[in-house]
Amino acid sequence: MSNANPYENNNPYAENYEMQEDLNNAPTGHSDGSDDFVAFMNKINSINANLSRYENIINQIDAQHKDLLTQVSEEQEMELRRSLDDYISQATDLQYQLKADIKDAQRDGLHDSNKQAQAENCRQKFLKLIQDYRIIDSNYKEESKEQAKRQYTIIQPEATDEEVEAAINDVNGQQIFSQALLNANRRGEAKTALAEVQARHQELLKLEKTMAELTQLFNDMEELVIEQQENVDVIDKNVEDAQQDVEQGVGHTNKAVKSARKARKNKIRCLIICFIIFAIVVVVVVVPSVVETRK
């Protein structure tokens, strides 16, 4: 399998660093919206710095893998394994941080297309690095298995493929190697091969765990887009509901205004009718009385 290093391309973060430098050197005194965007870009710059650091760490992991596959002394091998474990631990810590930071950036850019583009750019870079890390681990897993198989066939040259595979997958190896250990002339070789195969087996278990975590992380980062869209849909629904409430409120208000106008008109009509009745009473009752009195 190919050992090609997926990190030999140019640094993909230079463009963002240049953009951030321009923003940091821009004159002050902008509006609150501009200040907010600069603060957001500072956050993006921090994410890109951690992405670059993450890339460097998995480069080191790739280099450690290659060194472990070469002929090294037992002391060198132990040192390489300690160093490899440290790099893997650093990568794991950064993965959690990057996931949280990118999710936070996406949340901040929920209603700003420029911010959304920057956050999405970081997410895509992270996805690529995760995929590259998975390829590195997958290559090392296959090469480690092949090396362990070669070590086993040194002491069991007539072993079938099934027997070799069983030896690689047996964590203890005692039963698999018992026949070889019975051969006094090859006892030392068998013990050395047993130790190597056991070490490779433990390494393969760690690799499988790391690869499972990377697969889960990759899926989580892909689902961030779905989650982000769901948040947008919820907000849009809330805005739509609020708009409907406003429209309904305006409708109720208009109805109340119309009712009030109608009530005022009815009141005026009643007053006019009362005035007419009063006038009729005056004409019919009061006026004749006054005329009669004068006579």
Curated annotation (Swiss-Prot):
Membrane topology reported for the UniProt record:
Single-pass type IV membrane protein
Q: Which residues cross the membrane?
A: 270-291
**PROSITE patterns recorded for this chain?**
SYNTAXIN, T_SNARE
Q: Which SMART domains match?
A: SynN, t_SNARE
Superkingdom of this protein's organism: Eukaryota
| Main location as per UniProt | membrane
Q: Which residues carry this modification: Phosphoserine?
A: 31, 34
Which positions fall inside the t-SNARE coiled-coil homology domain?
194-256
State the CDD domains in the record.
Answer: SNARE_Sso1, SynN
Q: One GO BP annotation here?
A: Golgi to plasma membrane transport
Q: Keywords in alphabetical order, please.
A: Coiled coil, Membrane, Phosphoprotein, Transmembrane, Transmembrane helix
Q: Where, in residue ranges, is this chain on the Extracellular side? A: 292-295
Which Gene Ontology cellular component terms are annotated? cell periphery; cytoplasm; endomembrane system; endoplasmic reticulum; Golgi membrane; plasma membrane; prospore membrane; SNARE complex
- Residue ranges annotated as coiled coil are 39-100
Cytoplasmic topological intervals:
1-269
Cite the Pfam families for this sequence: SNARE, Syntaxin
Q: Entry's InterPro entries?
A: SNARE, Syntaxin, Syntaxin/epimorphin_CS, Syntaxin_N, T_SNARE_dom
Record flagged with keyword Lipid metabolism = no
Q: Name one GO molecular function term.
A: SNAP receptor activity
**Does Transmembrane appear among the keywords?**
yes
Give the UniProt subcellular location, in the record's own words.
Membrane
What is noted besides the main data? Present with 1720 molecules/cell in log phase SD medium.
Q: Member of which family? A: Belongs to the syntaxin family.
**Per its database record, what is this protein's job?**
Required for vesicle fusion with the plasma membrane.
* The protein, known as: Protein SSO2
Which species is the source of this protein? Saccharomyces cerevisiae (strain ATCC 204508 / S288c)
Q: Which gene encodes it?
A: SSO2
